[in-house]
Amino acid sequence: MATLAAAPWFRVRLIPELKNSQSLLYCRGNHSYRQSLCSRRRSFSVYASAGDGGDVRVRFAPSPTGNLHVGGARTALFNYLYARAKGGKFILRIEDTDLERSTKESEEAVLRDLSWLGPAWDEGPGIGGEYGPYRQSERNALYKQFAEKLLQSGHVYRCFCSNEELEKMKEIAKLKQLPPVYTGRWASATEEEVVEELAKGTPYTYRFRVPKEGSLKIDDLIRGEVSWNLDTLGDFVIMRSNGQPVYNFCVTVDDATMAISHVIRAEEHLPNTLRQALIYKALGFPMPHFAHVSLILAPDRSKLSKRHGATSVGQFRDMGYLPQAMVNYLALLGWGDGTENEFFTLEQLVEKFTIERVNKSGAIFDSTKLRWMNGQHLRSLPSEELNRIIGERWKDAGIATESQGIFIQDAVLLLKDGIDLITDSEKALSSLLSYPLYETLASAEGKPILEDGVSEVAKSLLAAYDSGELSGALAEGQPGWQKWAKNFGKLLKRKGKSLFMPLRVLLTGKLHGPDIGATTVLLYKAGTSGSVVPQAGFVTFDERFKILREVQWESFSTDVPLSAGAVTR
């Protein structure tokens, strides 16, 4: 996909030089100084609050390891709405540092689904921008630059522990019923020890020095004050032994160098904030405002997953949902404007959205309500657009020979009230074109029709068809049908349900459906206009009356068991 090519790397914001006053919070400098400071490293307290001022810049940063989940789509939407409401920028960044799971196909699928949904990004893949590139896999040189700066400042040190040593630390911690945190084996190593391991070619990681006591607090725009005890966090890795940076380090560097002002993301990322805040402090960057959105839950209040049905945007698109309905519904999962209104366009959401009205409690995903909402949006479309969407669907499905025209317009008008999803239109038209007369007459619901003398109505209806009287009336459209039905009722001395229920069964083969007059006129026109594919299961008027003529009414007697021949043609 040419439009998804990497953006040029126009500009990268470099970190300022770290000041001694900041770095005194960490062990740094030469060995003797480091030993002295480390011995006094007992307590650390910082209140992490975002820098004020500047333009609003938010980002959505999906990992291309699968499809765009509705939870991710909602996060993207909230970021977009906040940016537009504040006159800011919405940035899309691809976090593809998981080399084993990230694929180009997944990235393209995510971008395609997000484009279909509607929130347009201002910077990112396919668009570019001055803070690119916008794929983490293309920013490795930047991560290494910052890792080296942290190493030089003493905020990071080389750790030569093997996997076996790390596993042993975990086992000991487990036996002592302690958190499985790194013990700091290489945190206070001498320069001679480090040089010796480097000379031997021992693999190493970069570990970030974490104060052993104290706490860290942030002001979350949704959850309020959130705090962590630092003694629960050991020195953590920011760069693996293969030179690949770790997620939390990449995210912090990217958000800082892309001038992200607000980080709006799912609450499952809240634990990552502790590590990221420490890295921000070490690099001397002002922190963004954080807002952690609650998870989307299944009806049983568990985390929404594949076992609950469709969960990705692409699945809902393929099922026949409209993007505007998805946007409307996702916005209401955890947000509301304080009124009873449930229907919003994307433009209206931009006008109404505030982060203060986002709830901290989990939102239940109700697929039934989503389907209902989609039907409301579908039926509110301008008739030209609705005809185009459904007409194309019918043609692509091999039911209609054309995607537009009088037949399409009339069929959409007749059937739209029973269509909630675009895909429902196929079943609706196929059902309309079918003629399950025998099945209906043989059903329990068909018994009252038989008892009401439907066979006598059938004889008169056949006579009207054979004479050309019915066809002539239907050729005139709805007015012709109404005039004919009125006269037909007088002839049989029937009216209302007594007239139209047997007519519905005899003409459509069904007990229920849309207006019988409009249905009959449409079926007649379908047979004369060539608008329906012959192989689409359409039973023409000639075929219907042929079937009707062959019905053995005595076989449907309520006092006699039905024979096999009575329910088959």
Curated annotation (Swiss-Prot):
Taxonomic classification: Eukaryota, Viridiplantae, Streptophyta, Embryophyta, Tracheophyta
Main location: plastid
Listed InterPro entries: aa-tRNA-synth_I_codon-bd_sub2, aa-tRNA-synth_I_CS, aa_tRNA-synth_I_cd-bd_sf, Glu-tRNA-ligase_bac/mito, Glu/Gln-tRNA-synth, Glu/Gln-tRNA-synth_Ib_cat-dom, GluQ/Sye, GluRS_core
NCBIfam families for the chain: gltX_bact (TIGR00464)
Catalysed reaction, written as an equation: tRNA(Glu) + L-glutamate + ATP = L-glutamyl-tRNA(Glu) + AMP + diphosphate
Pfam families referenced in this protein's UniProt entry, alphabetically: tRNA-synt_1c (PF00749)
Enzyme kind, highest EC tier: ligase
GO biological process, one term: glutamyl-tRNA aminoacylation
Motif stretch ('HIGH' region): 62-72
Sequence positions that bind L-glutamate: 59-61, 95, 247-251, 265
Gene3D superfamilies, per database record: 1.10.10.350, HUPs
Keywords: Aminoacyl-tRNA synthetase, ATP-binding, Chloroplast, Ligase, Mitochondrion, Nucleotide-binding, Plastid, Protein biosynthesis, RNA-binding, Transit peptide
Protein name: Glutamate--tRNA ligase, chloroplastic/mitochondrial
Family membership noted in the UniProt record: Belongs to the class-I aminoacyl-tRNA synthetase family. Glutamate--tRNA ligase type 1 subfamily.
Function: Catalyzes the attachment of glutamate to tRNA(Glu) in a two-step reaction: glutamate is first activated by ATP to form Glu-AMP and then transferred to the acceptor end of tRNA(Glu).
Subcellular location(s) of the protein: Plastid, Chloroplast; Mitochondrion
GO molecular function, one term: tRNA binding
